[in-house]
Amino acid sequence: MRYCCTVLSVSDINKARSFYEDLFGLEVCQDYGRNVLFSCGLALQQDFDWLIGIPEEQVCKKPHNVEIAFEEPDFDGFLQKLNGNPAIAFLSGVIEHDWGQRVIRFYDLDGHLIEVGEEMKMVIERFISNGMTLEEVSKRMDVSVDDLLKLLKYDV
């Protein structure tokens, strides 16, 4: 067995597809009309009720029990892109987690919660450029020095 994708219910496949392509640069690898699969493993499905065999009114909107998470190396640049998009409904502004990663959460066109955070490598590099040692970064982020070194070598 292998994991193949996560499927999101969408009301308009064309608008949803454009949203994910334009905002995140996702690439479609399969297009079946009412169903689109991106190369990252995210899929969009119009007429979700038909697909899984339930009444349309049982398809939930904004359940707040799952989020689609992305990491962005140019977080500030992405924020500028977001602020220029009138279709974006924000859950909140930018927050900084205890481990130092800045994130923002907002909704897609169908109410799915999305988180975009600074790439962890960038967080570590920001701390180091501000004069922190790896040991201090390790303590601040509650991550071992070995794991920090792995993250610093990680290339997307």
Predicted regions and their residues:
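N-terminal beta-strand motif that seeds the catalytic metal site of vicinal oxygen chelate
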Residues: M1-N14, V66-I68, E119-V156
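Short glycine-enriched loop/turn motifs at secondary-structure junctions
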Residues: M1-R2, V59-N65, D98
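Helical anchoring/docking segments at protein termini
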Residues: R2-C4, S9, D31, L37, ...
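Amphipathic alpha-helical segments
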Residues: D12-L26, G84
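Short secondary-structure junctions
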Residues: G25-Q30, A89-G93
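Short hydrophobic/aromatic beta-strand or adjacent loop that forms the aromatic wall/cage
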Residues: G33-N35, N65-E67, Q101
